């Protein structure tokens, strides 16, 4: 195990994640596939392995403590697989579905699922199935919080939670979107400020849940189907 993965294993423990040898091996495989495919399609703009391991792998693991054991997770706008693939590598108890409409990135995710050979990891494309199926909706690069909730909430069970991974202006965005979220019947559940090591990379996790006393039918009506 090289020093970078030793750092990943140590820092992951800060977020309640214990990485065994199998998980570290899968992260190593994932790293190499990311770099290979990035030569063909634009998956990321990181400069080196250290940035990928800290700003992508470790960053993705910061939400793990909020995900209940055995939960079903939908990662919308997964792109290169973040945060869904690192979460699944580290938490084999979870069922993780990656949603990606950009065709090149979709096929990369399909490839990674075949390479990793991890059970209960799927990739989907936007369509019209699977309403009210998931316990958690997670996203790192989808866009405004209110848009994420509007787009993703139909996929969640009644008590489902949305977790949006934001940068340093996350709370400002939450405040701006509050009137829209309130109208849709959603309220903030938690706000967690995190600083990742080495790069002093700041992350704000924002959790939202339905306010059942104010819930409306505002939101999209399409669902998701498997293309496996």
Give short role names for the model-derived ranges:
Residues 94-97, 101-228:
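S-adenosylmethionine
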Residues 1-70, 74, 104-121:
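Class I SAM-dependent transferase core
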Residues 80-93:
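Conserved SAM-binding loop of SAM-dependent methyltransferases across substrates and taxa
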Residues 77:
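Conserved glycine-centered beta->alpha loop in an early N-terminal alpha/beta scaffold
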Residues 5, 27, 57-60, 84, ...:
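A general structural signal for well-ordered alpha-helical segments in protein cores
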């Amino acid at each position: 195990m090289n020093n970078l993965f030793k750092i990943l294993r140590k820092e992951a423990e800060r977020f309640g994640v214990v990485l065994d040898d199998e998980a570290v091996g899968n992260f190593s495989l994932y790293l190499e596939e990311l770099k290979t495919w990035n030569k063909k399609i634009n998956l990321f703009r990181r400069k080196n392995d250290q940035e990928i391991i800290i700003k992508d792998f470790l960053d993705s693991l910061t939400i793990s403590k909020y995900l209940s054991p055995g939960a079903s997770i939908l990662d919308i706008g997964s792109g290169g697989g973040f945060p869904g693939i690192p979460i699944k590598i580290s938490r084999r108890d979870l069922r993780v579905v990656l949603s990606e409409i950009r065709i090149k990135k979709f096929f990369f995710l399909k490839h990674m699922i075949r390479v990793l050979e991890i059970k209960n990891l799927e990739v989907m494309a936007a369509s019209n199935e699977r309403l009210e199926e998931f316990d958690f909706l997670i996203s790192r690069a989808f866009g405004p919080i209110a848009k994420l909730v509007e787009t993703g909430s139909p996929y969640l069970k009644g008590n489902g939670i949305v977790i949006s991974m934001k940068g340093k202006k996350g709370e400002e965005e939450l405040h701006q979107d509050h009137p829209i979220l309130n109208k849709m019947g959603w309220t903030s559940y938690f706000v967690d400020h995190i600083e990742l090591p080495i790069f002093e990379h700041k992350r704000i996790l924002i959790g939202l849940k339905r306010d059942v006393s104010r819930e409306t039918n505002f939101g999209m009506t399409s669902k998701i189907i498997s293309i496996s």
